[in-house]
């Protein structure tokens, strides 16, 4: 049996860059081994599979290495694919461990993440990952603690003193992959924060990918991390808007926006441009 997979670029910046994702709309899911093989064949950080389910869609995500619980840029790509097939609107998505939604209008899609939260890092874990990233304590920003952020997946956040510090991070891929899989951490996120603007990278050894140009899942999780650390500026409605820049060091510039309330452990709305489908579907 063959499967049709389309390619979309999520979080493009003024029509350029973006993060590619495969999208497979199917009547029934392929078996797990086939979905993993398709993800490997596509070669993107994630490929998303969706089938009709109750009032919405049952959704699963695969990296080239394994299934992942949630992927932001693939969710936006899915939103664009669903809008192409069914028309612009809101779509309910049942993930493995959460229920979310995605909407699409014209070239912009918005997802609602699983509840976003964070917790502190122990010193031994922090030192382990600093060593993996060839960083010292002196590289860390004094204004925020390193931490673990969650919004469907776990992300390790390393706030650094400058954008150039973020750009210069290199890491031991094999050591990172082993440790991240042991600790159930999906990405390492070095970042620099100026007000409500975040410049960051997504190191994805756990998914067999050196770096992901952009991930909405990490953006949502970091929104929760900043909220928990009282690092956001809220409007009169007690909402905060964040702007993320990612992928620059890879030559794949990506822009994301996030909207979240001041209430802890609540979802984050992540938006961005989506381009595609790019070329004809791949039949696998």
Name the predicted role of every residue range.
Residues 1-17, 135-138:
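N-terminal, positively charged, Ser/Thr/Ala/Gly-biased leader segments
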Residues 13-17, 22, 31:
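Short N-terminal binding/cap micro-motifs at the start of the first secondary-structure element
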Residues 23-27, 50-51, 157-160, 191, ...:
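Short beta-strand-to-turn element immediately C-terminal to the catalytic PLP-Schiff-base lysine
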Residues 24-49, 163-193:
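Active-site-proximal helix-loop elements at catalytic-domain edges
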Residues 37-68, 193-198:
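Anion-binding (especially nucleotide phosphate/pyrophosphate-binding) glycine-rich loop
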Residues 56, 62-180, 227-284:
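Acidic, low-complexity central loop/insert segments
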Residues 68-71, 209-223:
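Short glycine/threonine-rich catalytic loop with a Thr-x-Gly-x-Asp
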Residues 185, 196-205:
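Catalytic strand-loop segment that frames the active site of acyl-thioester-processing enzymes
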């Amino acid at each position: 049996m063959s499967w049709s997979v389309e390619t979309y670029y999520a979080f493009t910046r003024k029509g350029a860059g973006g993060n590619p994702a495969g999208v497979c709309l199917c009547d029934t899911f392929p078996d797990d081994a086939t979905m993993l093989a398709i993800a490997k064949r596509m070669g993107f950080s994630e490929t998303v599979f969706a089938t009709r389910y109750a009032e919405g869609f049952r959704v699963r995500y695969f990296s080239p290495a394994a299934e992942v619980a949630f992927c932001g840029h693939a969710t936006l790509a899915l939103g664009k694919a669903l809008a192409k097939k069914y028309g612009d609107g809101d779509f309910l998505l049942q993930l493995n461990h959460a229920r979310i939604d995605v909407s699409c209008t014209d070239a912009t899609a918005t997802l609602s993440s699983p509840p976003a939260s964070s917790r502190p890092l122990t010193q031994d874990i922090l030192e382990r990952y600093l060593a993996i990233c060839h960083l010292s304590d002196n590289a860390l920003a004094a204004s925020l603690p390193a931490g673990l952020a969650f919004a469907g997946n776990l992300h390790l956040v390393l706030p650094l003193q400058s954008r150039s510090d973020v750009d210069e991070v290199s890491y031991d891929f094999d050591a990172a992959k082993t440790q991240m899989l042991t600790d159930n951490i999906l990405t390492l996120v070095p970042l620099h924060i100026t007000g409500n603007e975040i410049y960051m990278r997504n190191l994805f050894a756990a998914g067999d990918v050196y770096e992901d140009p952009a991930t909405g899942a990490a953006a949502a999780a970091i929104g929760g991390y900043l909220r928990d650390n009282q690092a956001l500026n809220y409007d009169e409605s007690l909402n905060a808007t964040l702007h993320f820049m990612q992928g620059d060091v890879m030559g794949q510039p990506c822009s994301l926006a996030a909207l979240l309330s001041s209430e802890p452990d609540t979802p984050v709305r992540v938006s961005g441009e989506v381009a595609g489908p790019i070329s004809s579907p791949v039949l696998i």
